[in-house]
Amino acid sequence: MTFTEYMGFFQDKYELICMADEERDNFCLDVESSWNITNMVLLDEATWPTYTNKCYYDVSGITEQVWINMRLNINIIPANNYTASENINITIASPGPITTICPQAITISQNTTLTCQQMAIAYEIPTAGIRNLKIISIAIGVAAVNGTNPTTSNTTATFVSAPTTTVTGTTSECCEWHTVFSGDTCQLIEAEYGITLEKFIALNTYVNSTCGNIWPDYAYCVSGIATANSSTSTTAITATSTSPPIPVTTSGTLTTATTSGTITTPAPAQTGMVSGCTTFYEAISGDGLLRDRHIVRHHA
C-alpha cells in the first residue's frame, strides 16, 4: 500500500466520509464494530451523511461491511471491490436518487477561513471530494483553507479607484478601500477586513510600523497587491512623520513665487506661519488639513 493509499484509508476510518449513527454520532470504525451492517443492508437501513452529496469515491482499502453500505448508497463506476475481505452474497436493494454531477470547483467567499469539515458541510461534498477538487478559487487577500494547500484559479482581479484622496506609497492595484474616520485605529481596520498589520503596511507603505500616522478622510487599501508602485516614503514627508501626508490627488491650488525671494502670505492662513516662504498650498475638504487655511510647502 502506498503512502497516499494509506492516508486515504486513514481518513476513511476517522473522518466524516462513511456513514453516521445520528443517535450516537459514531463513524466508520465504530460503525464496523457496533452495527450489523449485513442486516441493515437487507432492511434497507444503511445510511450516508445527510449533509453530503453521494459522489464518486475511492473505496480502496475499505472493509467489506463499509463497501456494502456504499454500494447501496452510491453508483460507483467501475463497481470493483478492492478489499481483501470475502464477498458476502446477498441481494442489495436498488439505490434511490443519486447525485451524479459532483462539483469540480468551488469558490470561497472573501475573508473566509474554513476547515475541511466545515467546507464539507457548507458545500455539501465529502471531505474526500474536497481533496479531489480541480480548483479552489480564493479571492485576493483571503486566508487559505486550514490544513490544505489549494491550487488557486487564474482569475483576473478587478481593481477599483480610491473613493477619496490617497497618500504616496499606496498601491494602485487595490480591490477594496477603507476611508479613515476620526477614532479609527489599525486594530479596528484589521478586525473589520481580516487583514494583518504587515499586509496593511505593504499596501500602504506610507504607514509606519506602529500605525501611528493614518489620517481621517484619506483612503487606504485593505485588499490588493503590493507592487512597485508602492513607495517606502514621500518626497516631502517621511514615513515616520506625525504630520498629515501630502496627498497624491487633490483639486487644491498652489501659489508659487515667480521670481526669487518670498511672496506675500495669502489669507486666510493659520497662526505660526514661517517667514521666507516661496510656495503655498490651499487646503481643501478631504485633505486632512485645516479647511480654508494656507499651509507652507517650501520655505527658504
Swiss-Prot record:
The keyword Protein biosynthesis does not apply. It comes from the Eukaryota. Disruption phenotype: Leads to enhanced fungal virulence, with faster decaying on infected fruits. Signal peptide: none annotated. Residues 176-222 form the LysM domain. The keyword Cytoplasm does not apply. It holds the Pfam family LysM. Keywords: Chitin-binding, Virulence. One of its GO terms (molecular function) is chitin binding. Belongs to the secreted LysM effector family. Non-secreted LysM effector that might be involved in manipulation of host defenses for successful infection. The LysM (lysin motif) domains are small globular domains involved in binding chitin in eukaryotes. LysM1 contains one LysM domain. In plants, chitin acts as a microbe-associated molecular pattern (MAMP) that is recognized by lysin motif (LysM)-containing plant cell surface-localized pattern recognition receptors (PRRs) that activate a plethora of downstream immune responses. This is Non-secreted LysM effector LysM16.
